[in-house]
Amino acid sequence: NTTDPQDIQNAAVKYPALNIFDFQHFRMAHIDYMADTALQWHKSGGLVGFIWHWSVPVDPGFDLQQGYSFYLPSAAGPQKKGTTFSPQKALQEGTPENKQIHRDLEAITKLLLHYQSQGIPIIWRPLHEAAGNSNRGGTAWFWWGNDGAEAFKQLYLYMQKYLMDHGVHNLIYVWTSELDDDNWYPGDAYVDIVARDQYRANNNHSAYKEQFNILKKKYPNKMLALVECDCMPGASQMVADDAMWLYAAPWTVPFVFGSNNTPEFWKGFLHSAPILTRD
C-alpha cells in the first residue's frame, strides 16, 4: 500500500492520516519490510497500521512446495488453494503446526521490533474476521477460525503473549466483529479497538449507523473503526447520525476510487471539519 495515499493526495490535496500495510508477503524476498516506507509515513506525521493475512502451509504433510494459504478450502474459491491448518494443533508445543507459527511469529517479531526501535506505534489487526459465517450456518473463512471460537481466542492470546514476551510493546490491537460473534471476542483486556467490515454499500456514503450502534452497545468501552469497506462513510452523515467511526479504510483497488469513492468525494471528505488528515 505505497501508492494509494499519494493518489488520494493528488485528488484531494491532503493525505489521509492513516496508511495500512499488510505482512501477507513477509516470506517473499523481493519485498523488504525493513525498508523505510512506513518510517517515512510516520516521520511525515502519519499513523501506521498493519494487518496480517497469515499464510501457512497448504499441505497437511508440510510439503512447502505446495505453497501457502490463509483461506480454508471452503472459502478459497476455484483459483486459490486452501489449508486445513489447525489452531488447536498449533497451540500444542512441539507439533509441526506449533513450530510453524513460532517461525512465523519470530519473523514478524523482528519486523515489529524494527518499527518499535524507530518510535512507530502500530494499529495492529491480526487474525481478523475469525468467525466468518460460523454463526450463520456456514464456516470460518480463514485457518485461525478453523477450530471454533475457543481455539481462536487461545491463539489470539498466545500470539499476543508471544509478542509481549519478546519485547513488542508498540501495538494497538484491533479485533474485527461480524456482529453475531460475541463468543469469539478475546475480551476487553486484550483488545483496544473493535472493528467492522462493510461491503455492498451501493455507493451511498452512509454512516452505517445501525452497525455502529450495535457495536457501541456490545462494546461500550471500546473505540470503533470501519476497517474495510467498498464505499467510505460520509463525514456529514457520521456527524448527523452520531456514528463517528475512529477511522475508515476502503479495501484498496478497486474501492479507493472508481464509482465507490470518486476524487470529488475524497476532496470533500478530507476537507471536512471532523476529519483528521496527515497534514
What function would you assign to each model-found segment?
Residues 1-27, 35-39, 235-237, 267, ...:
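N-terminal module-boundary/linker segments of secreted carbohydrate-active enzymes
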Residues 121, 125-128, 156-182, 221-232:
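Aromatic-lined carbohydrate-recognition surfaces of secreted/lumenal glycan-active proteins
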Residues 5-14, 33-45, 74-76, 112-119, ...:
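Acidic (Asp/Glu)-rich catalytic clusters
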Residues 2-8, 33-36, 108-111, 176-185, ...:
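Alpha-helical scaffolding within the catalytic cores
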Residues 1, 222-279:
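Substrate-binding cleft of secreted/luminal carbohydrate-active enzymes
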Residues 27-158, 165-168:
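Substrate-binding cleft of extracellular glycoside hydrolase catalytic domains
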Residues 14-17, 44-48, 117-123, 164-172, ...:
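Loop/turn elements at helix/coil->beta-strand transitions in domains of secreted/extracellular proteins
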Residues 181-203, 249-252:
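Aromatic- and acid-rich polysaccharide-binding/catalytic face
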